Amino acid sequence: MFIDTAKILVKSGNGGNGCISFRREKYVAMGGPNGGDGGNGGSVILVADRNLTTLLDFTYRRKYVADNGEDGGNSKCFGKKGEDLYIKVPIGTVVKDVETGKTMVDLAKEGDSYIVARGGKGGKGNYHFATPTRQAPNFAEPGMPGEERMINLEIKLLADVGLIGFPNVGKSTLLSMVSKAKPKIANYHFTTLKPNLGVVKIEGANAFVMADIPGIIEGASEGVGLGLDFLRHIERTRLLVHVVDISGVEGRNPIEDFKKINEELKNYSVKLWDRPQIVVANKIDMLYDEEVFETFKKEVNKLGFDKVFKISAATRDGVDDLIKEVTRQLSMIPITEMEIPEEERFMPEEKRFTYTIRVEDGVYVVEGSFVDRLLKSVNVNDPDSLRYFHKVLRNKGILDELKEMGIQDEDTVRLNDFEFDFLL
């Protein structure tokens, strides 16, 4: 089972409402408004963490919601900000917006972070709305709703080095010899059904991560078997180590195997085919005809590969020299972020003031989260508050949309339980 993609719902917190309150102190006449601002809602933030290698955790939890901001208080007390929700993901996680299908971010390095849902802004308290002619505003600003979206997570970077080759050529054995990884090893095809990772440490050099990529078969680039899943796992490795079974004990032809694997790489992605590649002839401990290796080496040289490493992963013969070469080449290959064409990048849209208008039995019904929160912060029995309410409806385009829909003088408009007659 491949746990390299996951779809989750993220929702940031709503902003707290501004407070409506007035100073009430002895000997202080007409103390004035002192309602505090609401706190901002918490955001949902993804963070790349080197300690994670799969998206397995997201199969058990699909919804992530940050805290709401608290409402403002009297005496100009600000509401508490909602706690941000941090979600750890593996390095190399690519995040896409489900609705648009566009890439939001590529978390390519340790500690990279991205806000996938920004918390709603807290509303202003009534003290902000005091003017020389409106000294006691009996209204406040509502907090704004948070963002909610479905996102796709996809791992496109599992390791610095990818071990590639047909099934059962010794990739898992090699990984177990050079790291502390303990992959399942057996003598049958598709032993490895998901990438096994191992950290390879060599004295005097930086450690690197090596992945035993599941065996590729013919037609992998066209989706045969688990081919596309396999190829996706090596798309972001910096260096490929191509392992072939030089012994031929299973009746395989190492030259044909080598060509077929490279053909699948090329069909899937030319960039992947151009990736630096170290050729490894494994199982020399079972090789009974040295001429087989020499013939293989000559054919590989013709294809543009100057050197072939001759090893036995089982006995560790030649493995140390191979790892030194891998380390040397990695030191010259920069870690690059995946290029995202500008037109494919996700651009968040402003959806804070969403509402709908419908006509029901001659009544214009305005609905939406913004309308709900606005009504909670308006005193419909106060003239100043109603004037502010009218101003908000005008500024947000609701009144203009009602006119475009053909509303007439004295037609009824309903917002939740509040109704009023429209005047042109």
Curated annotation (Swiss-Prot):
Keywords in alphabetical order: Cytoplasm, GTP-binding, Hydrolase, Magnesium, Metal-binding, Nucleotide-binding
Primary location recorded for the protein, binned into one broad class: cytoplasm
GO biological process: ribosome biogenesis
Chain sites annotated for binding Mg(2+): S172, T192
OBG-type G domain ranges (all copies): 159-331
Record-level Gene Ontology MF annotations: GTP binding; GTPase activity; magnesium ion binding
Domain of life according to the entry: Bacteria
Domain OCT: 345-424
Cofactor: Mg(2+)
Binding residues annotated for GTP, in chain numbering: 165-172, 190-194, 212-215, 282-285, 312-314
Compartment annotation: Cytoplasm
A GO CC term assigned to this protein in UniProt: cytoplasm
SUPFAM superfamilies on file: Obg GTP-binding protein C-terminal domain (SSF102741), Obg GTP-binding protein N-terminal domain (SSF82051), P-loop containing nucleoside triphosphate hydrolases (SSF52540)
Obg domain span: 1-158
InterPro entries: G_OBG, GTP-bd, GTP-bd_Obg/CgtA, GTP-bd_prot_GTP1/OBG_C_sf, GTP1-OBG_CS, GTP1_OBG_dom, GTP1_OBG_dom_sf, OBG_GTPase
E.C. numbers: 3.6.5.-
Oligomer and partners: Monomer.
Annotated function: An essential GTPase which binds GTP, GDP and possibly (p)ppGpp with moderate affinity, with high nucleotide exchange rates and a fairly low GTP hydrolysis rate. Plays a role in control of the cell cycle, stress response, ribosome biogenesis and in those bacteria that undergo differentiation, in morphogenesis control.
Homology family: Belongs to the TRAFAC class OBG-HflX-like GTPase superfamily. OBG GTPase family.
Protein name: GTPase Obg
Originating species: Clostridium novyi (strain NT)
Phylogenetic placement of the source organism: Bacteria, Bacillati, Bacillota, Clostridia, Eubacteriales
UniProt gene name: obg
